[in-house]
């Protein structure tokens, strides 16, 4: 395989000649430090290479070494709880090797530790017919995750050998498959190219909600397992905290958090918090189900693209094991900016705001890899990849290309409103601009498993919030006193919805996570208040009198979100009794 020669260097873009027979997206090693790069365009025998490391000090005429392979990552036991850079190099191994807090250029570190021995338990026997995706054994990687060892997708045949139960490294052959006369060894670890989606048998309709513990996300704009969501918002509106809450509390089996081009101190916060946090679903440390990819803003821009693909490929791998995985990316705007930067250096024709014309197709490729699927292989199993990505529009302008193109491909839109953030309403998700295409799909799950009136209560809350916005303009002009009594009740119910339900403190031990049952109990209180109060207003009782009769009950309902724990829901029975008692007294008065 002939090596190339550098002819031009422009930041992260390197042009090399003598690259005859090179392949698109082939990985190359650039210059004497052997920096990792990827071929993104070929013209004759010239190759345009985006380099994933700092190119300072590289000179023309230095060699470019070809590898003949696409950008691939290692998949196997040892991923969970690890912190990787954008090229899947473990940061702790780099620090041990370099004795420095900085990532040295051209450093080669295995992604999965070669020395650790894992206890392998075989699940198949010699002579079995196997195909790609079959589970041939398990490794208990952490107390939360049973790592299922899969046959690589394109391997099939008769199992010629399988090792006995015991301890093995990721490079030890654990099985041999007779594939059309060839002996193919299978190890605990496999490699997969990041740009190629992993195969599955069938894509399924997402019908089960991914519970996040955040009330506005679970109830007003729910996301299903296998769904796609975007969180756009200007600086300071709470994107990172919302995504961190998703990563911490969501009901996914595996969470992959990709910090793509965001500030280093935000990733540092993550790395400090995660080891001490407990998973609310199991009580175990959160790191036992989490993988972190740290690719901060001071790292080379080209590596942002790699980090997004590395994250989604790892998510697909755990999906194929039959797990529900969540990929959190913060933020895709930084990836799009990297595409714009590289497109400009490659002298491509720019589209809107300088972004490349292929931006929509790249975003589509990324979001299409989400979904709930029936996996290949035996035994039959189902898995999902849910994608939630932040978008950082400059100045909060949702019409800019990245946000507007993202909206074409996602089914859930959680827009953050800076005016809500300034009013200290968190999460600052605008309930008028947001949407979810999964409400109808997940309503049956909520009605069956949580509360049969869930859909009715949710729709009442949404209608009230929309009506309150319509009335706000009138209130600004002539004040609330000029409104009809039923409209005054709308304002009061909307205030209760916002204060008792939509507002949530991500830093409060009790309020940070609301179970589905707790959410339904709060909704039920609001629904009862609105239903009974509407009847009384129709009978001529003023809204003010109803609110005054409540005394401290409404503030008590508002405080309950941070006062009543998820396992103390019987306390809501007392609040319900008090509420109904007040309305019974008012009805007696109205009847006399």
Swiss-Prot record:
Its main location: membrane. GO terms for cellular component: plasma membrane; proton-transporting two-sector ATPase complex, catalytic domain. It is found in: Cell membrane. ATP binds at residues 233-240. Pfam families: ATP-synt_ab, ATP-synt_ab_N, ATP-synt_ab_Xtn, ATP-synt_VA_C. The keyword ATP-binding applies. Keywords: ATP synthesis, ATP-binding, Cell membrane, Hydrogen ion transport, Ion transport, Membrane, Nucleotide-binding, Translocase, Transport. It comes from the Archaea. The keyword Translocase applies. It is a peripheral membrane protein. InterPro entries: AAA+_ATPase (IPR003593), ATP-synt_VA_C (IPR055190), ATP-synth_a_Xtn (IPR031686), ATP_synth_asu-like_sf (IPR023366), ATP_synth_asu_arc (IPR005726), ATPase_F1/V1/A1_a/bsu_N (IPR004100), ATPase_F1/V1/A1_a/bsu_N_sf (IPR036121), ATPase_F1/V1/A1_a/bsu_nucl-bd (IPR000194). SMART domains: AAA (SM00382). SUPFAM superfamilies: C-terminal domain of alpha and beta subunits of F1 ATP synthase (SSF47917), N-terminal domain of alpha and beta subunits of F1 ATP synthase (SSF50615), P-loop containing nucleoside triphosphate hydrolases (SSF52540). Its EC number is 7.1.2.2. It catalyses: ATP + H2O + 4 H(+)(in) = ADP + phosphate + 5 H(+)(out). GO terms for molecular function: ATP binding; ATP hydrolysis activity; proton-transporting ATP synthase activity, rotational mechanism; proton-transporting ATPase activity, rotational mechanism. GO terms for biological process: proton motive force-driven plasma membrane ATP synthesis. It is an enzyme of class 7 (translocase). Component of the A-type ATP synthase that produces ATP from ADP in the presence of a proton gradient across the membrane. The A chain is the catalytic subunit. Belongs to the ATPase alpha/beta chains family. PANTHER family: H(+)-TRANSPORTING TWO-SECTOR ATPASE (PTHR43607:SF1), V-TYPE PROTON ATPASE CATALYTIC SUBUNIT A (PTHR43607). Has multiple subunits with at least A(3), B(3), C, D, E, F, H, I and proteolipid K(x). This is A-type ATP synthase subunit A.
